[in-house]
Amino acid sequence: MKANNTTTSALWLQITYITMEAAIGLCAVVGNMLVIWVVKLNRTLRTTTFYFIVSLALADIAVGVLVIPLAIAVSLEVQMHFYACLFMSCVLLVFTHASIMSLLAIAVDRYLRVKLTVRYRTVTTQRRIWLFLGLCWLVSFLVGLTPMFGWNRKVTLELSQNSSTLSCHFRSVVGLDYMVFFSFITWILIPLVVMCIIYLDIFYIIRNKLSQNLTGFRETRAFYGREFKTAKSLFLVLFLFALCWLPLSIINFVSYFNVKIPEIAMCLGILLSHANSMMNPIVYACKIKKFKETYFVILRACRLCQTSDSLDSNLEQTTE
């Protein structure tokens, strides 16, 4: 009887997990496609920072389209070849690191904007932006795919079983030493600390500029006022990323020391990490005025079935 109850509760946990993953994936895809559409339509948002925001949105769309379906497949523990399971698990990691690298790029860009106000446009050329974006994604793929090049559990599994197939589960193929020391500490925790320091310096610079006697320099005060609001909004995006990803990272860290973690805690940690991908569009809508205005224009246009010409004219009115 007790075994039946355990099986039933495990089944309900799996059904609930899959349902919530599907809902999160749908919201992440729709919300972040809307973010990209907003940047495409609103010319005033085509700045360096928003190129990096689009990069972050692409990573979040990939979470909805690729990561969540693969996470569901991995949770079902389907029987497959070791390297097929490992590749699926690595894909989950690639887009996590794409998000953190995009956030780092955004932080560096905002820092350059307030630190090198006059030289900013000459430093952040179009070519350098694309090079930096390419570097961010290259690092993400290299870090995420590292287990494919040998840092995995194949040798451990070969010692315990002769078959090359297994019930695919993330921890069956990816070692906790990689997850804790390389993926988390080196490529998530350290960048998070660096970004916090960058934002603290940004706020310090802006506060100093605003506290100076800038009588007669209204434009300068207005510039730093806008930068302060934007920095606060983007720091909130960073804070939410940390809030969503640290619980799962802490679970992995604790598990490394052979502490048994309840299955429900693991599921909640995974769901929270994936939920981060649907939060950013909401933050932009609430905190960035131009985003909010363009969202409303798009929603109004969709409701009234407007043509692209009328949509453009409405956008011109909002940007004036």
Swiss-Prot record:
Q: Share an example GO biological-process annotation for this protein.
A: positive regulation of mucus secretion
Q: How does it sit in the membrane?
A: Multi-pass membrane protein
Q: Sugar-bearing residues?
A: N4, N5
Extracellular-side stretches of the chain, per the record, are: 1-16, 75-86, 151-179, 258-263
In terms of domain of life, where is this protein from? Eukaryota
**Annotated GO MF terms:** G protein-coupled adenosine receptor activity
Keywords, A to Z, come to: Cell membrane, Disulfide bond, G-protein coupled receptor, Glycoprotein, Lipoprotein, Membrane, Palmitate, Phosphoprotein, Receptor, Transducer, Transmembrane, Transmembrane helix
Membrane topology, Cytoplasmic segments: 40-50, 109-128, 201-233, 287-320
**UniProt key word Nucleotide-binding:** no
Broad class of the protein's primary localization:
membrane
Q: Which residues carry this modification: Phosphothreonine?
A: T307, T318, T319
Expression tissues: Testis, particularly in spermatocytes and spermatids but not in spermatogonia. Low levels in the brain.
What does the PTM comment state?
Answer: Phosphorylation on Thr-318 and Thr-319 may be crucial for rapid desensitization. Phosphorylation on Thr-318 may be necessary for phosphorylation on Thr-319 to occur.
Q: Which family does it belong to?
A: Belongs to the G-protein coupled receptor 1 family.
Q: What is this protein called?
A: Adenosine receptor A3
In which organism is this protein found? Answer: Rattus norvegicus (Rat)
Gene transcribed to yield this protein:
Adora3
